[in-house]
Every structure is written in C-alpha cells, then in structure tokens.
Swiss-Prot record:
Subunit and interaction comment: Homodimer.
GO biological process, alphabetically ordered: biotin biosynthetic process
CDD domains xrefs: Radical_SAM
UniProt protein name: Biotin synthase
SMART domains the record matches: BATS, Elp3
Amino acid sequence: MRDSVIDIRGLDRVQRARVQAKEEAPKRWSVDDIVALFELPFSDLMHRAQSVHRENFDPNGVQVSTLLSIKTGGCSEDCGYCPQAARYHTDVEKQDLMQLEEVLAAARAAKENGASRFCMGAAWRSPKQRDLEPVLAMIREVKAMGLETCATLGMLKDGQAEQLKEAGLDYYNHNLDTAPEYYGEVITTRTYQDRLDTLDRVREQDINVCCGGIIGMGESRVQRAGLLAQLANMERPPESVPINLLTQVEGTPMYGMDELDPFEFVRTIAAARITMPQSFVRLSAGRQSMHEGIQALCFLAGANSIFYGEKLLTTGNPEAEADRKLFDKLGIHPL
C-alpha cells in the first residue's frame, strides 16, 4: 500500500507551510514557514526539534560559557530593555573598564568551574581605539589559558574586527534583538543595518558569529518568527544563537511588560533548532527565572549552550553548583 501524499496545491500559504513543517526544511525559511513550526502541536514540535538536534549534535552535551561584564553602565544607546543605558534610572552602577588582572582572575575561576568559553562584554555603543587596546590584551591572555574567547563590544568600525582576529578572538556577539518590523519599538539610536554591517565585518575576518535576540519584549509570534528568519537566512547562519528571555529591570521602558508564556519560549527554542540545525542554541539571559522543568524542556527542544555561574552582565544567573545539579538530574555533560 502506498503512503498517502498530501496535495498542497490547493492550500493557502500558511496551510502549505504547516504541511511542509512536518516534512522537510525549505532551502530558505519564510516567516510563514516558521510560524507554522510554532503552531505545530507541542509534542510534534518537540519531536521534530529533538530529531534535528540528534542529527547534528550529541543530544546530552551542552557547551558552557561564562560572561563577564568588563565595563558596566554609562551606555549612550536607548535599548528599551537595558539597565546599562545612561538615560535610564536603574540600580546599575557605572564601572570603568576592568584591569587585566581582574579579568584573568575571573577567567581562571570560570575555567575551574567547567566553562570552555569566556565572554567579555562592554557597555559601549562602539569601542574607541584607546579602549580596544586593553581588550585586545585581555583576549590574548584569556586565549593563552586554553579558553575560547568571545567579546561583545558594540558596533565595530573598519579595521577593528581585524585587530580582534589578530588577538585571537574566537567569537563576536552582536545580537539583532528582534525582527526588523518590531525593531523601532526597542531601540532608536542604532539601525538594524548598523547591526548587520558589524556582523559583516566580523564575518569578513572569519570570526565566529554569536547572534540572536530577546524574546518577551511585547513582540508578536509572527515577529518572533521574523527574527528567526533573519538569522536562519544569513549566508552563514550564526555559529552560536543566544535566545534571551527579557529580564525586566525597574527603570527601563520595558519594565512591567506582560510576561511571556514559558511554553512560547520553549517553542522559540525548538524553532531556532529546526531552522538552524548546525548552530549552538544558547539558553541565555532569563534562565534564572525559569523553573528547572522549563529548562529541561528547552534542552529537549535543542538548546545546547548556557552561561554558567557568575553574573550574566547585569542580571542574576544560577550559580555553578545549581547548574551542575541540574546537569546531573538530566544526564547532561559539558562539551
């Protein structure tokens, strides 16, 4: 008996996308395609995501990073979610660029706690050359410890990506934050194209790209799908895709927004895994607010990278020991 074949010619765009979502990945993901993934029954979506995950990764392995804020607060941008913006009245205290030895001490502690990558974040719109020089020294010294290095420093000017590459930088983080259609609701001091231009400069130097977004900022499901479409359809999708859950900080414009349903966040992780099968999908900011059960569902949905211990820029993050206990419960091991 022949397997039944669905004739999709008479279906509308969304119906066709739903059928295709159950079958095979398109060469280029449309927003409709990704919305159709979101709309699958939860068990079907999880099965699809886990199947894709197992085809490309050790299903029980998770890459572990530690993120250190090497320069905090005082940023001139107006990102509506960010407590480091100088224009917002938050509890974040401005701190100048850390000294090299302070950073190296944090990197040693991260390595001892099982991290394989050390990420350095600075609250700049764009680094000045005089500020970049000490960061280059940090990258070289952390790299010499045997850790992978990552930096998030804001927009890069011509020539700066080359300097980062020469210093040995492995990853550069620069998020798109949200879909182009919703971007103006989040930030006005930097354009979407500015972000894409920085990513192009990073790619030109063959530095791995870490690029994702923030979920739960009031965007629609279609706009969440739009963010994933932007990422998945890049000429080379990001090697690392951080999916952040908005951490609401009093004093920022996005404080007091309706909280995202946890299962919608899990669906976002699953859709990211399906659309970017060879990328590491990082369960990033907001994890400290998640019940262990939701974190477990995120791992099942294809998340295979986390930030471990320390502080995630200016928001809390579960301590390393709590993470180890969760890994033990789930049979997960660090990569």
